[in-house]
Amino acid sequence: MFLPQEIIRKKRDGHALSDEEIRSFINGVRDNSVSEGQIAALAMAIWFRDITLPERVALTMAMRDSGSVLCWKGLDLNGPVVDKHSTGGVGDVTSLMLGPMVAACGGYVPMISGRGLGHTGGTLDKLEAIPGFDIFPSDDRFREIIKQVGIAIVGQTRSLAPADKRFYATRDITATVDSIPLIAASILGKKLAEGLDALVMDVKVGSGALMPTLEQSEALAQAIFGVANGAGCKTTVLLTDMNQPLASSAGNALEVREAVQFLTGEYRNPRLLEVTMALCREMLLSGGLAQSDAEAQAKLQAVLDNGAAAEAFARMVAAQQGPADFIERIDSYLPAPMLSKAVYATTSGIVSTMDTRALGMAVVALGGGRRRASDSIDYSVGLSHLVQPGDKVDGERPLAVIHAASEASWQQAAQAVQHAVMVGQQQPASTAVIYRRISQ
């Protein structure tokens, strides 16, 4: 039996904690024998003192084991169980295409996703723009959908890493959210509970990212890579750009529409295509579904071209209680905004830079996101037809189309977009979409 205060004292004084001490503390978080004050104290001690890689692995495994861990062995799946996780951003709709694409290539993707909070969008919120879509199927139904369709996207249940929920809630109010080892443990505690054969992490970099600077993002990427592989899950990490929205739209129903356009071939934003393909290739390679980049690329292009990826998305929607003809009748199912109108730059010129976080907060202000976890969402609002750095803007070419619930909210969003998009007279330097790959 380890006393929580002695564990806190040990870390406060800069000593390494044993696996048993870490597991004892996290078990106490789960069963409420450890108080909120004690969680806050340990989190702050970790923030100041950091923890070693073995401690990080032990913390992550304890978070994972605080609840149920999915096991797929009894289902006789004829392919690998793989997933992707992104640190989040604006217009990051990759999950909605990536899951069906990998499933169409023979993988199984049990994606447990989250809601949006702050300026970042949430995959669950996007899917709830689809009428009837059930993000909380029973465990048996979840397993059944994975077996039959190959892809299901669901929310975190109470049985999944429950200690992390309590630990994170305390971090959120004690200025310890930005602790890299605690971020890694929180992300991976949930992901490893999925029972994965392989994981691909997308760590965002830039003005719309969790960690704005490349240095911070690389530190987080290295932490996630070390912990996940140390915990026995084959993991690759990509660092990708979030200095502008990833898609051409930002907002729940708007991003669902763009995902369907991507899968059917109607429209594919080049940056979104590059990141989605790169993540999918890593999933195929990590899962043994392809032996080279070229083979993975060919398989992915084939399932886009022959409609298999779009079909997998349609089957997932139907299996999770959404409309069976959603793709064919998308206009009749997605909610329509009260007002859609373009916003223009105050001066003509060339888009130089974008404050991606500010664009995300403009969507939140429209009603498309949450400031607090209890807030409700207007799924119809957001931004579409977004410009990119290097685009010319004038009285003919708008910065974006704003979809709003009222003229007043449109006006507020228009000002926010005009302030967030900087216009100059020279072409900006081209920047990478994918900065770095970290793998074994």
From Swiss-Prot:
Pfam families: Glycos_trans_3N, Glycos_transf_3, PYNP_C
Keywords: Glycosyltransferase, Transferase
PROSITE patterns: THYMID_PHOSPHORYLASE (PS00647)
UniProt GO cellular component terms: cytosol
Domain of life: Bacteria
SMART domains associated with the record: PYNP_C (SM00941)
Pathway assigned in UniProt: Pyrimidine metabolism; dTMP biosynthesis via salvage pathway; dTMP from thymine: step 1/2
Enzyme class: transferase
Gene Ontology MF, one: thymidine phosphorylase activity
EC number: 2.4.2.4
GO biological process: pyrimidine nucleobase metabolic process; thymidine metabolic process
Record field: catalytic activity: thymidine + phosphate = 2-deoxy-alpha-D-ribose 1-phosphate + thymine
Homology family: Belongs to the thymidine/pyrimidine-nucleoside phosphorylase family.
HAMAP family recorded: Thymid_phosp
Function: The enzymes which catalyze the reversible phosphorolysis of pyrimidine nucleosides are involved in the degradation of these compounds and in their utilization as carbon and energy sources, or in the rescue of pyrimidine bases for nucleotide synthesis.
The protein's assembly and partners: Homodimer.
Name of the protein in question: Thymidine phosphorylase
Source organism: Erwinia tasmaniensis (strain DSM 17950 / CFBP 7177 / CIP 109463 / NCPPB 4357 / Et1/99)
Gene: deoA
